[in-house]
Amino acid sequence: MRGGAEYLASLRDGRAVFLDGERVTDVTAHPAFAESARRIAERYDAARASADVTTCLDPGTGKRIGAMWLIPRSAEDLGRRRAVHRFWAEGSYGLMGRTPDHVASVLTAFAGWRQLFDRGGRQYGDNVIRFYEKARDEDLYVAYAIVPPQIDRSIPASQHPEPFLHPGVVKETDAGIVIRGAHAIATSVTMADWLYVSYITPLAPGDVDYAISLVVPVNAEGLRLLPRRPYATLATSVYDYPLSARFDEVDTTVVFDDVLVPWEHVF
């Protein structure tokens, strides 16, 4: 498992975060984000020191992995997973619900039922497994964006006057698919390594271009992050605001400005 210093270094990757109209060059140093990033880093260090709770042996490979990546096949496995979720929740007194174990569970569930993705062709099931193994082996922090902007939801995505308010496929190429549009409420993405993108709202039969399921690195070219105002910017001090100043996941609007997603990252 990686430690806190490795995690913080991974965030200094040129990601395009904008706050108050200006680009944030380093979320680990900016006062709006630094405290929350440090809390996650501290928990990564604590996870290393608590390996009996936070890790386990992978039944398939025999290698030690983070328990949040364990595909459960028994009641004992479920107990291990419960323990690691409790570990991460205790680190923020329950205030952070989108810590690294959260979307790790989504990807682990995908890998545990890969045949669902094979319905679109075996390639997609293979893609799920490959990315799951990458995220597991590198102990990645993955966030997700699944909620479209608050526009008229009585109108199908494909029938809006501006067709790419919702994120959708602009075109397909040999290299992958090109995504344009925006999602809202991408919680914790400013502190994550990768972003899983899909839809939580129902899609109409004609919305095929919006039926997406994919992953992108947070520093992908064309991906812009527009967070709401972090609570730390309103706190006079960490002493006076010990919780909100340190445990803010920062909901974020993510804008896809023709982001190329390689086929291997499409599920």
Regions found by a protein language model. Give the residues of each.
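Acidic/polar, glycine-rich intrinsically disordered N-terminal extensions of enzymes
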Residues: 1-59
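General beta-strand structural signal in soluble alpha/beta enzymes
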Residues: 19, 143-146, 178-180
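Glycine- and acidic
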Residues: 19, 112-117, 237-239
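Glycine-rich loop at the start of a catalytic domain that most often binds anionic cofactors/ligands
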Residues: 30-34, 60-71, 157-160
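Generic structural signal for well-ordered, non-transmembrane alpha-helical segments
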Residues: 34, 38, 133-136, 178
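Internal helix-loop-helix
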Residues: 45-142
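A short, Trp-centered hydrophobic/proline-enriched beta-strand micro-motif
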Residues: 139-152
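FAD-binding core of flavoproteins
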Residues: 149-267
